[in-house]
């Protein structure tokens, strides 16, 4: 745990640079809020034009402060903030919070000012700039002018929030308070000139007051640090939930302009989150809903959900949404159904189906307790959703108390769906330890997040490939696109099996090669300039040896007519019979280097059924994917059933596919930045025990 970050979040003394005596001004709020919310440390306002703020003496400058503050809140504009930062650093202050905007997010001049700020800080840590600050609810410390702090009190709980947007931090704080959701720490990192997401994820992973970490992300500036921090949180048993904006082109552009940073492709973020166990919130409301469920500490170990209701329509709504998401809502087993009947719920109750509808009898606290206990004790169910209907509005305390009384009986998740518009009941349930939601979809999202946490296993780290692995014989390859034969020779060196083939120049050589390979063959042009050979007539399949010579001549003429280049070299390749065609490729952007796997062949771009996994890093060097990650890629494809024996098809050689993915990733790791582009399409995955075979390939070296 960083000492500077510990002081930033729990300072014994706070200097407020540019403080105003008017609490109605932004510059007056930090001092006012510190006092309003009971900060027990020393407050040191600095303003040469003000003598006192309330009963606090105000100092003319940083040099006049009677002590070195742990933290300073800098309220000056961008033109003057760096000078205050320099003076604070000179005094030995641990960290400064710089609120001013007008830095990298505004363009070149702002970037210059941001660099000036970095130089002024030296070794002092900086939160911001362009930040709204932070709030430590655990210890009652508010270092922010956010208007959300006008509220008198906030529920304190186990959810830590890190946001790259100051406005969103205030929104989450006020929304959580209104719903009775307890938070521990909230930090707005914003421009991240120094301290960033990863620093606070790492810190919160060690924070005993935080059980769940919620992130609002615009961009990840240092993927390796982010990955390490998230894995640390996972090892500590602290789930991380992230809402990442930039899913659309417009959103991505807005995110970049807001933070002044490069953004990776959205699907790359999906891959990164999946690999480090981060739950991706699909909506902004999920960013509170999912952590609220996880903060209970209850764990979900299956997909079978009991729905207890007193209103049929709302129960059906929840059941339908759960079913769409892949959850099961089985009927009660015989013993559970009998236990429910023994409660004497009345003749109108529906106890042998799910949702279990106890009708208005469910308003009796004793009956409700009995039904909840019976369902939680049932081996048929992994979780329970309780529907709070309109009839409960008259007795919310009795209802909440009855549910709360049953929580110690089981560690299974218990959620509530509040069907009417009754936010006060939802907040009451939240305060009693029952995650309560105003939408059926929120119940589903919360359970899906809990299931993802239970299923995550950190993949084994593959060893760093030696720089020389597979490099023998590559010195002669110059920068630029290789032809197919050269590309596949490189793939083969790294352990990717390739189809048997011969390079030829003449019809006679082609016929001899075809006879040597045996059976029917494929004829292709060899060119480093023409990537999509079939588009210009440069591929012919199923050729017999006696026909290949004549076909070579016609192919040369056709390619010359279409591409303006007469091919001089050709490839005669063994036909690959059977198997499933996949594509294996390399993708690189601001987040890092990733391997892509998907449905291959000529339909690859049409179906867009792909999986991405980022290569891990160790000591600054890329590593191959671990076999577990490679297998997870294959299983995540929509077309996975085709590999797994769908409708009587022979099972594919998945272990050989996993080996090929790992080998391809080892090539990407070993060659590093020298690989500009790499793709095998198709790679044939043959029936079980027969291996895989790369039938075409592209490799561009930088």
Please report, for each region that a protein language model flagged, where it lies by residue.
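Catalytic-core regions of core metabolic enzymes
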Residues: 1-702
